[in-house]
């Protein structure tokens, strides 16, 4: 199984995985509208020979089979206040 990965031009670090190049037929229209015009990032085999950054390969494969797509969102931002308070407590 292969997947085609597209990056969002509107949302930083947001990626859309589909099974076939330029086939967004199973992706909800509202998601595509918010995602923007998908920009091809890469095509990867999902056989475990390559590691996915920021996504679990099993979850991606399951989502592709069941829903027809997988949406990878950016990691949550760390709270600067939390970091500051943590550093202040170390002093």
Curated annotation (Swiss-Prot):
InterPro entries in alphabetical order: YcgL-like_sf, YcgL_dom
PROSITE patterns: YCGL
Domain (YcgL): residue spans on this chain: 1-85
Pfam families referenced in this protein's UniProt entry, alphabetically: YcgL
Organism superkingdom: Bacteria
Family annotation (PANTHER family): PROTEIN YCGL (PTHR38109:SF1)
Protein name in the entry: YcgL domain-containing protein ETA_15380
UniProt organism field: Erwinia tasmaniensis (strain DSM 17950 / CFBP 7177 / CIP 109463 / NCPPB 4357 / Et1/99)
């Amino acid at each position: 199984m292969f997947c085609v990965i597209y990056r969002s031009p509107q949302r930083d670090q947001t990626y859309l995985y589909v099974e076939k190049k330029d086939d967004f037929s199973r992706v909800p229209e509202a998601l595509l509208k918010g995602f923007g015009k998908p920009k091809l990032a890469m095509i990867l085999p999902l056989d475990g020979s390559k590691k996915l950054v920021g996504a679990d390969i099993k979850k991606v494969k399951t989502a592709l089979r069941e829903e027809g797509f997988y949406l990878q969102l950016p990691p949550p931002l760390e709270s600067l206040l939390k970091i500051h308070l943590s550093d202040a407590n170390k002093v």
